Amino acid sequence: EPINNLSTKRLLTMTKITGMKVKEFINKTKDKNLKNKLALNMFKAWYVPFYEYGIIHGDPHLGNYTIRDDAGLNLLDFGCIRVFKPEFVSGVIDLYRAIREKDNDLAVSAYKRWGFKNPTKKLIEVLNIWATFVYQPLLEDKIKPISEMPTGKYGRKTAEKVHKELRKIGGVKPPREFVL
C-alpha cells in the first residue's frame, strides 16, 4: 500500500512486503515444482508487461525481486521504467518470428519498425547473429535447465563477433528507442 504522506511525484513510499531474496528462496526450496513456478513467474514478469503493454522494468537484477512462499514475485525499484511504442513491440515479436522461420523480409520489416533506416542485407545478417543469441531460449518450446544454456563466455564471444562485423561495415547508429 502507498504511504501518501511520505511519497512525492518522484518518490513512491509503500508499506513493507514480505519475501526472501531469490537465491535464498532457491537454496531453501526443495520442491522442484515451486522452483519451476518461480522461473515461469520471472519469465512472465519480464515478457507480459513488454509484449502486452510495451513496458519494461529497466533494472531487472536479482536484487530487485523478493520471492513469496508461493513463488510469487515482489518487484522492487521502479526507478527505471521504459515505455515503448506499439510498432516497436510488434517489431520485437516479428523479429523473433523472422529468426524462427528464417524470414529475411520479416526481419527487415522488424528492424525498420525498431527505427533502423534502410538496413542493408549485410547489416541484417550481423544484427541477426545477436538476435539469434538473444532469442535462443525462446526458439525451443521446452523446459531447458540452466546447465544446458550457453555460458557467459559464449555471450561475450557472440557480442565480440557482432562488434567486429559491425566495424567491418562501418558501424551502426542504434535507433534512439533501441537504447535503454
Label every model-predicted segment.
Residues 63-67:
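Hydrophobic residue at the +6 position relative to the catalytic HRD Asp in the kinase catalytic loop
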